[in-house]
Structures are given as structure tokens and as C-alpha cells.
Amino acid sequence: MPENKNDKENKNDKENKNTKEEKKKVKFSNIIWVYIIFAVFFIGALISLNWENNPIISYSEMLSLINDGQVESMKINQNGNVEILSKDGTTYESFSPALVIDKQYVNSLIQKGIKVEYVESVGTKWWFGLLINIIPIVVMVLFFFWLYRSASAGARSSMNFGKSGAKKYEPIGEKVTFKDVAGIDEVLDEIEDIVKFLKNPQEFQELGARMPKGTLLVGPPGTGKTLTARAIAGEADVPFYYASGSDFVELFVGVGASRVRDLFKTAKENAPAIIFIDELDAVGRQRGAGLGGGNDEREQTLNALLVELDGFDTSTGVVVMAATNRPDVLDKALLRPGRFDKKIMVGPPDVKGREEILKIHTRKKKIAPDVDLKLLAKRTPGFVGADLENLVNEAALIASRKKKNQVEMSDFEEAIDRVLTGPSKKYRIISDKEKKILSYHELGHAVLAYLLPNTDPVYKITIIPRGAGSLGSTLQIPEKDKYLIKKSEILDRIVVALGGRASEKLVFNFATTGAKDDLRKATDYAKSMIYRLGMSKRMGPVYWEGEEEEIFLGSELTKQRNYSEETAKELDVEVKKIINSMYDKALELLKQNRERLDLLASYIFKNETIYGEEFKKLMSKDLEELKEYIGGEKEINEFLKIDVVNHVNYQPV
């Protein structure tokens, strides 16, 4: 008769309890042996400290002491050993059998005032000597016995070395369920079948259907792959065994394979159950691509995993799940149907998903009424679940730092800035000369972003230093999520990226290091157009990006180039052509709006930060109205008088 679920759980709990009790006994026994050895050494040290080492004198020296009247008392035993106490308190030992026999001489000693006493033993007690001889032997015996026990324990430990290190997930407090997962509704729809199968497998088997043997969750870090697996365990209410891929790989060949077999054995014994392997790429990388024989252990572990996935019966009720953010390096045999035959993409959430995730993470926070989660979701494109959780926590920390009772919208906006660009450098002192350069640089980006039709709206312009190397920033946030980008949009993005350098050229006629990141972005956009997207008329709709050569277990060491040197030169020429033409366009647009650029630069020089709504109003005003709004001619002239060229050593363009 097969065991029911409760019997199996009771059996498993009993085994775990017995294992814990055995560990406690072994630990207690080891402590006792340590105390015994310590006690033996302590007694030996105590005996050695109390050892009476009296000086031994000859018979003639003893007679000399007696004749000189220096003896206070004498103790004599039947063997002729004599203990002499002198009047100055010194104790001597000597040997004189005659004192045992010659009673007359002893009487003469008594007449001289010497106290004479016959005793059984003289000097060092007999058991002291016995202990001194026995203690080293006892210590050696105990030491070797302890070594023997340690070796036995080591043998037992080595027997357990191949045991799986997978942990059984036991939630503390409330279980994680699908209510705690948001922003990935399509993923939850896909994995709902797994929960139904674990709860009622007969429903599937009656129709002749089988569950996929392995389900692979694929997606960028922080999208909720592990959280999804925990939610499945909470919904299905079955044992959930989880391990990291790195837990299986050890120094010794064969250990990882043994752990894989042990994990599947444990799961089968407690079926229905879920096995979840996080970071699968640590153990499931491509075989046979290594530069040497150092990956034998990894390959054996992978082979064992392949056998277990293909070898166990799906009717046992064991579901295998895994997560990775590097599906490109996984072994092809691992992904074939019959193993991890169901792949679920867990991507970044859209704006609606981000709003739902923010609702979950703000449930237990004291949120002010002015907080608009829908607006926050729009302002955080590209954020994944982990980023949003960090954002909410950062906002709560900011509010706490300001001694607020609730987390306000301003705290969330500051948290967005901290997450995107790092904390503000409040105590970094920037000279007026460099501040003026930063003002023109950032306004160069912002003005072009406003003028060009295919760019995202400006959210914030600031010349406050943030993070490691950012002296200022112009943040643009899309109004909605985009999945396709037109060529005209990419070109406009390049123009905006080059706006800072173009503004420096136009106003100061020199270049600064502040445009380094802008140039990298512009170059990446241009290379993508030519090498990967086929957006060049001259080079045609061809994908020129080289194939990645996976030299060592999927790591990208080089890229194989499948075109000639002449073609490579032509590709580089096309990239430069795009960059140069967009730079010229940026310069021309800024020239046409030079007066507005000066006015806005003086405004941000004074205020340091301009938000999107205010920036739109400033750009929509006519020049006279804008000049009056900023503060009039006097304020603008003071800003323009700041001499930058003669005081700052910058490289001319």
C-alpha cells in the first residue's frame, strides 16, 4: 500500500529530527573529550607545581648538622630514609639505615633536643611519583583515541560529502503566493499549469498529457525568476528544494554528480515536490569548449543532471525548475525537448506591471496621499522588480532621514535620482567658471531634445554633481514603453547625445572631458545602425556584427569577423559619417537658438535644477518674456561676464 502525503511528511520530519539528535550527541561527546584532555593536563600541571623537591645530603653532612646543633627534628622510616628539618626552616633528605637499628644513638639525639619521629614514608609521597609516571601514558592514549574518533568522524563526513546541499524551503510567516508577484502576468499564466499538475496530476494524466520535465525561467537579473519559483511552492503547498548551480561543482571530480543524484532521490521520496536550481549556467555551461582538462567535474555534474532529467518518470510528481540570465551559454542537450523543454521568458515589466509592483512594495509603507504610483511607473522605464523594490526602500530611507512621518512624492523623486545617477555631492565645490561650462553643456542636450520631434521628453536638467563622475545630467523619460525604434529616432538620439559637445564648441570653442559618456552613447548608436541593424544605404541591409567565439565555457573572449579589412574600413567610414553629420546638425540647431541657449544657461546657473514641466514653459516663451522671467538684462549680463577661456585650460576643438 503506497504511503500517503502525511505519512511521507511525518517520515521526513522524523528523519530530520533523528539527524539533528545525532549531530547534538556527536557535538556533546566531542565537548566531553575536550574537557577530559584539558583536565588531565591541568592535574599534571598542578602536581608538577606542588612537587616537593627537597635537597639530598650525605650521611656525613647530616652528622655535621647534628653536631653543630642545627637540627630541629627528624623523621625516619623503616627503609632508612631520613627527613631533616633544620632550625632555619630548610628541609633535607638523607639515607641512614643505622638510625632504624641503633636505638641508643637515636636516644642521644633526643637528649640533644632533637625531635625524632618514625613514619611510614619520607619526602615525596609515593602516589606523586606514580602519577608523574602514569600521566604521560594516559595523555598519549587519550590523544590517539581522540585522533581515532576524529578520523572516524572525517570518514562519516566524507561519506556525506556527496550528499546534496539543497535546502528545503520552509517559509517563515506568510507564504509567498501569486498575489506577491506582479508585472509578469504572462509568466504566471504559463506556470499556472505547473501548480494544477502538482495539486491534481490525475487531471492531466487522464487526458494523456504530461507535464514538461523541466521548466526554465530566462530573463535579466532582478525580474523575479526566483520569486516566481517560491510563489509556485507556496501555491502548490508541496516540498520545495532549492539549490544554486555552484553548489554542485566542487574541487573533487564526481562529488557534483553524486549531489545531483541525491537531490533527485530526495525529491522523489517526498513527491509531489519541486526542485529549483538557481543560476543554472554555473553547472549547465556548454561542454567540450574548455582550454584544458580542468572542467571534468563540471561536465560530470552536467551529465548526471542530463540523465536525471531524462531518466525519471513524470508520474512521480517531481517538477524541475531552473533560472538563468545566460541562456546563450547553456549546453544544447540541456535545452532539448524532454529535459528543459519549457522555456518561459521573464522580462522587464511594462508601465502597468511597474505600477502593480510598486503597489506590492508600498503595501507595508506609510505612503503620503500625494504619491502617484502611476506617474512613478512612467518615470521608471527599464526598471525591473528588484530595482523598484530598491527604489521604494530608498525613498523610505530618505523620508526617515528627514524625520518625516510618511514617504512623500518628493522622496520618491529624489530616490529616482539616487538610483539613476547616484547620491548628490553636496559638499563638492565647483567654481563659477566650470559651473558655466556645465550649464551650457546640459542645456545643449535639453534644447535639442525639445526641438527634435523623435526624442523622449526632458524630465530633469541639473548641474548638481552626482555619483562617481557625473557633474551634471539631463534625464529623458519616455511617455510609454517602446518595442520598436525607427531610424529617425536613433539619429535624433545621436544629435541629443552630441548636444553637450556642440554647445561647448559653439560658445567656448573648446572641448572638455564632460562629453566622454555622451560620445560613447553616440558611437554605440551609430555602430548599431551600421553593424547590426542594416541602416546604411551604402553597406546595405546586412548584419555585420561578428559571431561570438565561445572559447572557454561560454565566455566571450573574441568575436569572429566574417568580412575583409576593406569592408571593415568602409564600415568605420559609415559610422564616422553618421557621427559627423549629426554633430553638424546639433551645431546648426544650437546656432539658430543661441540667444535662448544663453538665457536658459543663465537660469540653470542660478537655480541648478530645472524640471520637465518648467522647462517646457521656458521653451514655449518668446525671448523677451523669457528674459523678463529669468531676471532681466542685469542678471544675464553678470552670467555672460564670467570669463572661462582665459582661466581654464581646455583643449581647443
Swiss-Prot record:
In the central section; belongs to the AAA ATPase family. It comes from Petrotoga mobilis (strain DSM 10674 / SJ95). It is found in: Cell inner membrane. Its cofactor is Zn(2+). Homohexamer. The chain crosses the membrane at residues 31-51, 127-147. The lineage of its organism: Bacteria, Thermotogati, Thermotogota, Thermotogae, Petrotogales. This is ATP-dependent zinc metalloprotease FtsH 1. InterPro entries: AAA+_ATPase (IPR003593), AAA_lid_3 (IPR041569), ATPase_AAA_core (IPR003959), ATPase_AAA_CS (IPR003960), FtsH (IPR005936), P-loop_NTPase (IPR027417), Pept_M41_FtsH_extracell (IPR011546), Peptidase_M41 (IPR000642). Binds 1 zinc ion per subunit. PANTHER family: ATP-DEPENDENT ZINC METALLOPROTEASE YME1L1, METALLOPROTEASE M41 FTSH. The gene is ftsH1.
